[in-house]
UniProtKB/Swiss-Prot annotation:
This is Codesane. Short linear cationic amphipathic alpha-helical antimicrobial peptide (AMP) with potent activity against Gram-positive bacteria, moderate to low activity against Gram-negative bacteria, and low activity against the yeast C.albicans. Has been tested on M.luteus (MIC=1.7 uM), B.subtilis (MIC=2.5 uM), S.aureus (MIC=3.7 uM), E.coli (MIC=3.7 uM), P.aeruginosa (MIC=31.7 uM), and the yeast C.albicans (MIC=25 uM). Also has noticeable hemolytic activity (LC(50)=105 uM on human erythrocytes), indicating it cannot be considered for therapeutic applications. GO terms for biological process: defense response to bacterium; defense response to fungus; innate immune response; killing of cells of another organism. Keywords: Amidation, Antibiotic, Antimicrobial, Fungicide, Immunity, Innate immunity, Membrane, Secreted, Target cell membrane, Target membrane. It comes from Colletes daviesanus (Plasterer bee).
Length: 18
């Protein structure tokens, strides 16, 4: 679902921001 998709994408976004 949406939550699992966010859980997958969020760490990558955080890496990009960092």
């Amino acid at each position: 679902g949406m939550a699992s998709l966010l859980a997958k994408v969020l760490p990558h976004v955080v890496k990009l921001i960092k």
